[in-house]
Each structure stands twice: as structure tokens, then as C-alpha cells.
């Protein structure tokens, strides 16, 4: 059985002066080597959840437990932050070094890591995100996707238990988004890294292992992507779209082209259409 890395139990939070709760009675677990996406329209509570998990705010009720032992509180917040690494949406705002290597080792220098160990962590982190050939490049010379991969490397160098992506692909072009999503999938599959992705991009969420839908501060639904995106009517009712491949598949079914599976990518959909055509 996989080890539980993060658990929220009945957490609630209300901003001062607000009439309603931003989060209400939210409970879920995150397991080792799992990629979970949290989706929801604006105002659903996604950003508030990210702030709570990183200890920027503390829940008014309920608990957040990391690695099955550490409960988030004012006393433990700095220890929790060592276990949870965050990558934010604007890659340009995350660079603090003049080169890729300067940026990745910045956090390591701050904790006084010996140089030999720091170089080892630097090279390992850049290899994980396939940016080892850009060691001495300046940030302005990189694409958006490359910048986010360097930001991920900077977090991985600190070896947190959990990687949280807070709208990390929202400001990227399609190619940049693909680069980041492919990197995340590789980190999960090959290295067993645990990822929580807070996103409005349903194409990205469709690639994860599990999806949590937040609506008005509460968990509306939770399940594997195939299960979640079957309920396209429910998603549209709360202001969310569905992946393009799901839309196309639904149109085909209305035209009596019966498909066996829920297709979360165009590649998967095209492959089944090709098989159907080959049988004729």
C-alpha cells in the first residue's frame, strides 16, 4: 500500500469580512508517487487551498497532516514548508539567479549546504527536468516552458516530499504547457514524486492520476479522470469545460459512431477511430 504523504481533514477557512467560507469541510489524501489535480472555476477555493497547504494561512477548523506525523500549525509551519515545494504561475517572477545554475542552487545556498553536495543536487535536479544542457544559460534566453522546468528543478533540489503546482502552466503557450506536463508525468512515473496540481486547465488535469473538483469551497466530486470527464453536463453546470477530445467524442456518439472508451487525449481518440475504420 502506498504511503500517505498529505492529509486534510475537514479543513475550513473564511477570509476576514467575507460572508461565506472560502473552504468548507474539505478532506482528501495524497499518496506517494501520485499526481492529483484540483480543478474548479474562479472562486471555487483552489487558490485558498494552495495558501493553506503552504502555511500562508492556517485553517480555522480541521487539520493538515504531512508525512503522517507533522500537523500544520504556527509552531510547525517552517518544517512543513521544507516538505512542500511550490511552483507558481509566472516563471519570470520566480527567477532569482543570473543563470540557470545560480537559480537552482539559490535555495541550497540559503540553508548552508556544502558545495560538493550542492553541485550533486544541482546536476541531479536539472537531469530530472531535462535541462542539464542549459546550466549556464541566462533566464531571458529560455522559453516559458523551459523557465518553469528550471523552477521545478529549483524546488526538487531541496528534495521536498510533495511538489505543488499552483496554476504553473496558466501563462504558458501550448508548447510550454506540453513540456511541463510531460516533465511532471515523467517525475511521477519514473521517480515516484508526489504532485498536487492546482489548475483551471482541464487538458492538464486529464493527464493526472486523480481529479478533485472544488465548487464554492467544497469538494463536489473526486475520482480518476475517465470518471470525472464522463460527467460533462455536471462540469458545464458549474462553469467548467471538458477536454477537446471529450467534446469531439460526444459529437461522434450523437452521430451514432459508438466509441468504447472515454478519450482524454486526441491521440487516444484518433487511435480508436482508426481501429473502427480498419474493421470496415
UniProtKB/Swiss-Prot annotation:
GO cellular component, one term: ATP-binding cassette (ABC) transporter complex
Binding site for ATP: 40-47
Name recorded for this polypeptide: Energy-coupling factor transporter ATP-binding protein EcfA1
UniProt entry tagged with the keyword Transmembrane helix: no
SUPFAM superfamilies, sorted: P-loop containing nucleoside triphosphate hydrolases (SSF52540)
Highest taxon listed in the record's lineage: Bacteria
Location in the cell: Cell membrane
Organism: Bacillus cereus (strain ZK / E33L)
Predominant cellular place of this UniProt entry's protein: membrane
NCBIfam families assigned: ECF_ATPase_1, PRK13635.1, PRK13648.1
EC identifiers of the protein: 7.-.-.-
Residue span, ABC transporter domain: 6-241
Subunit structure as annotated in this protein's UniProt entry: Forms a stable energy-coupling factor (ECF) transporter complex composed of 2 membrane-embedded substrate-binding proteins (S component), 2 ATP-binding proteins (A component) and 2 transmembrane proteins (T component).
Summary of the function given for this chain in its UniProt record: ATP-binding (A) component of a common energy-coupling factor (ECF) ABC-transporter complex. Unlike classic ABC transporters this ECF transporter provides the energy necessary to transport a number of different substrates.
Family per similarity comment: Belongs to the ABC transporter superfamily. Energy-coupling factor EcfA family.
Positions of disulphide bridges: none
Enzyme class, spelled out: translocase
Keywords from the UniProt entry: ATP-binding, Cell membrane, Membrane, Nucleotide-binding, Translocase, Transport
Pfam family, one: ABC_tran
GO molecular function: ATP binding; ATP hydrolysis activity; ATPase-coupled transmembrane transporter activity
InterPro entries listed in its UniProt record: AAA+_ATPase, ABC_transporter-like_ATP-bd, ABC_transporter-like_CS, ABC_transpr_CbiO/EcfA_su, ECF_ABC_transporter_ATP-bd, EcfA_1, P-loop_NTPase
Amino acid at each position: 500500500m502506498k504511503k500517505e504523504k498529505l492529509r486534510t481533514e475537514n479543513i475550513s477557512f473564511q477570509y476576514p469580512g467575507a460572508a461565506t467560507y472560502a473552504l468548507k469541510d474539505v478532506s482528501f489524501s495524497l499518496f506517494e508517487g501520485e499526481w492529483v489535480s484540483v480543478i474548479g472555476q474562479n472562486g471555487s477555493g483552489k487558490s485558498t487551498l494552495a495558501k493553506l497547504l503552504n502555511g500562508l494561512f492556517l485553517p480555522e477548523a480541521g487539520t493538515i497532516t504531512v508525512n503522517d506525523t507533522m500537523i500544520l500549525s504556527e509552531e510547525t509551519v517552517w518544517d512543513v514548508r521544507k516538505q512542500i515545494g511550490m511552483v507558481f504561475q509566472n516563471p519570470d517572477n520566480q527567477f532569482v539567479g543570473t543563470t540557470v545554475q545560480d537559480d537552482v542552487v539559490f535555495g541550497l545556498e540559503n540553508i548552508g549546504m556544502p558545495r560538493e553536495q550542492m553541485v550533486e543536487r544541482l546536476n541531479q535536479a536539472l537531469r530530472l527536468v531535462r535541462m542539464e544542457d542549459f546550466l549556464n544559460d541566462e533566464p531571458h534566453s529560455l522559453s516559458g516552458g523551459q523557465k518553469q522546468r528550471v523552477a521545478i528543478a529549483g524546488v526538487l533540489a531541496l528534495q521536498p516530499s510533495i511538489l505543488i503546482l499552483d496554476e504553473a502552466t496558466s501563462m504558458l503557450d501550448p508548447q510550454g504547457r506540453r513540456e511541463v506536463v510531460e516533465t511532471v508525468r515523467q517525475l511521477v512515473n519514473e521517480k515516484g514524486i508526489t504532485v498536487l496540481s492546482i489548475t483551471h486547465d482541464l487538458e492538464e488535469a486529464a493527464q493526472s492520476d486523480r481529479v478533485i473538483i472544488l465548487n464554492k469551497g467544497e469538494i463536489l466530486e473526486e475520482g480518476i479522470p475517465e470518471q470525472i470527464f464522463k460527467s460533462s453536463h455536471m462540469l458545464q453546470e458549474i462553469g467548467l469545460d471538458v477536454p477537446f477530445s471529450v467534446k469531439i467524442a460526444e459529437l461522434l456518439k450523437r452521430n451514432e459512431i459508438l466509441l468504447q472508451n472515454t478519450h482524454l487525449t486526441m491521440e487516444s481518440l484518433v487511435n480508436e477511430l482508426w481501429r473502427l475504420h480498419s474493421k470496415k
